[in-house]
Amino acid sequence: MYKIPETLSQDIKKFGDLAKGYAASTVSGTEFKAFRVPMGVYEQRKSEVYMARIRATGGVITPQQLLKVIDIAESNGSNLLHITTRAEVQILNLDLKNVQNVLTQLQEAGLATKGGGGNTIRNIIVSEFSGIDPDEAFDATPYAMALTSEMVAEADSYLMPRKMKIAFASNPSVVDYAGINDIGLVAEVKNGQRGFKVYIGGGAGSKPTVGWLYKDFMPVDDLYALVKAMKKFFNANGNRKNKHKARIRYIFYRLGKEETFKLIDKYFDEELKAAHKLDVESYVTPKADSNGSTIVLPFKWGNVWLEDKEKLAVLRRLLSLLSEIGSDTLRFTTRQNIRLRNIPENRKAEVEALAKEYDAEAFDQPVVLSNIVTCTGADTCRLGICLSKGLANAIFAALGKSGLDLSLLDDARINVTGCPNLCGQPLWSDLGFVGKVLHTDHAYPAYQIYVGADYVNEPKLAESVGTIAAYNVPRFVVDLVKRFIDVTGIAATLGSKLSFGAWLRSEAGKADAEAIARRYTDIPLFEDDKNPYFDWGSEEVFKVTQRGKPECSAGLFDMITVDNDSINDARGKDNYAVIFHASRMLLVTRGLDPQDAAGVFDAFKEYFIEAGYISKSYLPLIEQAKAEGSEGKYDAAQAEALADAVIALYKTMDDSLQFHSPAEATAEAPKAEAAKPSAEEKKEEPAPAAKAEPQSADSAVKPTRSKDLRGVLCPMNFVRTKLELATLQSGDILEILLDDGKPIENVPGSVKLEGHEVISQKQEAEGHWTVLIRKK
């Protein structure tokens, strides 16, 4: 195990002091968050409910430690452990008053959460087979442990522009996560010397890319110097203004590979002169019996529920048995399961019996069903668009009932993510799905399909083969697997074996996937069949504005991204879709959310064409689209030109949501009015209370202007707040009225992130809130 940092005790004490101050309102939420997040403690979707993320380098934890984690979770009120896609474990559903106790008890067990969140070096990934893979160059685990011990103790590991992710691969033929991390290290042996092939700048999140090959071979002794140099390089060159463009890959996008490598070389050369080496030997464990077995203990979506006491008792017995066998007998995996390893042949039957007793159905199911990975999605993530867990469950059920021989899929990877942020890593899978919004006469949940990532040989992201309604995805998956099984049968007659991933990486596999996707492209209109307009796991008709948004600005830009991506998808294929998404793309910046296509075109005409931001030459095109809809015949060049004009305008938008003419970037654009509600919004907006004029929450502070935002959903309420602030002078005070719940939880915090001062927020007797904001 890695070495616990010496400062951990005082860090935990400081956490406790800040938590008490926060509870007593003597410490601000911002100050508390700034400390607790790098300590690996996050607030969950429900206010004042917390999660502690335990660092488990390489997924390593001893059976005795995991038993202790279960005890700690239970005794502190948690009902759930969660295994993450970085092979670590979280304790969820904690009250703040119990978190310090959790951290202290974890420390006593040789575990820590420090560095589990924020702009830090996150949990380091190592292949789950490292140390037991007969084809590995060498076991990378001791190097990851030694590196973790150094990094969690260094202050500059907590001051970076954004998080840094590191991954090791022990087998030179299986690059895996080393190909998509900020620093990827693939074990190699050359001329008897150990070293690493080094990739830099990879990332599977938004604007994804595989890493750039920095070193074909780097001696293991240079490992510390490399990572130290990367921290210094990142601190000096990372983007601290825009967290959405702050990861290392954005430096490559900005400067190009050659210039970026030159800068890294400078820092690397300086660190090599210091000649500091990692103490790897302290972390080497005796080699286990090479004849030992490995078994996967599956957990659906990585969840280890603690409420079923009978099952939990079986898990405790299993962990106790593993403790008798040895300490290196389990690892968390990036597929959110536990891999049992180094199981002697004479104990294998005992271990398998307990694993099966814990969850017989999961233990006996085909491996592919245990390998479906999903982000939390819109049911718990405030940035989510689609209910990704609902879709994952639907895929799971459809495959399970298909009657197909799923054993032929071996350990195929299927990944689902609910929005373009790509937290579920769909572009690093055999078959991936990315949630988005599409429209007919009504919005509906959809998924862009990706196939064929190469995580085995040379790193390569999956490629898109189409976009279909969420409703059709399970049937698409079953049809795709049927086709694969047919192809596998043909291959078998020719004496060859084909994996699901290899097939989807082939041109023939991609072509088959694209052809099957085309069968499911069209859906009926809403008035003809409402089923495709419901998301999986939801009983309400799909609507983007129903999704919660934690950071209002993030939600705003996410909605813009949906339309921007839809424009790119539709170019050359569907001119009406290009016109529709171009017209809708920037309406959110004016606090508008029309519920039908006619409303979109009317609002675009009023707020962008008539306001002078977009040329009036596009008016006939907009009127045609409004009148003829998807059945019309449109000039492709005009549709594309409109989209280009809207995207160019978006690039001129400043932090106050004001636009400048793309043709004359220096000229002032027309002043945007605070958004006028559409006719539909006027109907929905509640009538003012008997005392129509909002009253100040602080009689000593008189507002310059007041705005009633009750009944306005997130992020529209934030947009309207920004637009109001844009018309005020620095130091002026804006008073807004917000509903209880998400509006008061989200808007003040997002306003603070913009640099404005929230003077006060007070809940009124009627239940709504009055908030005073001083413009920066």
Language model features with spans:
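Peripheral terminal and linker regions in Fe-S/redox and tRNA-modifying enzymes
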Residues: 1-568, 669-686
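A glycine-rich helix N-cap at a beta->alpha junction
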Residues: 108, 754-764
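Long, charged low-complexity segments
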Residues: 554-569, 583-673
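Alpha-helical protein-protein interaction scaffolds
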Residues: 568-577
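An N-terminal amphipathic alpha-helical segment
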Residues: 695-728
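Amphipathic alpha-helical interaction surfaces in cytosolic regulatory modules
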Residues: 716-723, 740-756
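Core SAM-dependent methyltransferase catalytic element
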Residues: 770-776
